[in-house]
């Protein structure tokens, strides 16, 4: 009886173990399947995050490129100065003037001025000018008309001298800007002309210089002639004095005339008008005692 009970208990244990093994296998399979099912989710989440990062980088690059392109693109009107229907072209940032606002240089050396309308993408064309200063003055007029006292001016000290447009329409602004540029050019020309006049007044004219030079030359010539005449007179007087002295020396009285001749008759020699002769030459030479000849 006891043996039969033991056999039944062992059989029941074996049955329990055999029933437990499928449960364990099923749980392991469930765990494995759960792990397998969770791994695609993880991989999909990582791939989605990578894609989102790539998309964000691509969008940022596109935005940066758009900003650079928008900074390089400007609107200009080559034929119509009213600002409507202008052509779009890419311009280099180096064309802009480093000091004046709203001014840039064309390829052939002229300076253009334009200003953007408030809350609009269009620009008001202010004209083409020979100098950057004229274009800057035109921009100041438009800036005052559009933005008022908050406008950034190239010449803030001269704001009171700028003409004001009748209305804020583009045509009136363009007319006032052109007038300001022309007035600026006229003032510059007046200043240059006054400076030239001052220089001319400060320097003597060629006629005055020539007259002064001729007068100096004539004075010098007269002085030289006077000095020469004085020198010649001095030399003439010296020569005259010398001649008079020589005449005094050689015009001595003739000692051999009249009484003087009788006084020197007894001398051994006498002088007759620059000729020396022996006294008694006419009568011949005689010896008082005869010669005695020895045999």
Curated annotation (Swiss-Prot):
It is found in: Nucleus. Residues 24-102 are annotated as: Disordered. Residues 99-156 bind DNA. Pfam families: AP2. Its main location: nucleus. One of its GO terms (biological process) is ethylene-activated signaling pathway. The keyword Transcription regulation applies. GO terms for cellular component: nucleus. Keywords: Activator, DNA-binding, Ethylene signaling pathway, Nucleus, Transcription, Transcription regulation. InterPro entries: AP2/ERF_dom (IPR001471), AP2/ERF_dom_sf (IPR036955), AP2/ERF_TF_ERF_subfamily (IPR051032), DNA-bd_dom_sf (IPR016177). SUPFAM superfamilies: DNA-binding domain. Residues 24-53 have a biased composition (Low complexity). Probably acts as a transcriptional activator. Binds to the GCC-box pathogenesis-related promoter element. May be involved in the regulation of gene expression by stress factors and by components of stress signal transduction pathways. Belongs to the AP2/ERF transcription factor family. ERF subfamily. This is Ethylene-responsive transcription factor ERF034. It comes from Arabidopsis thaliana.
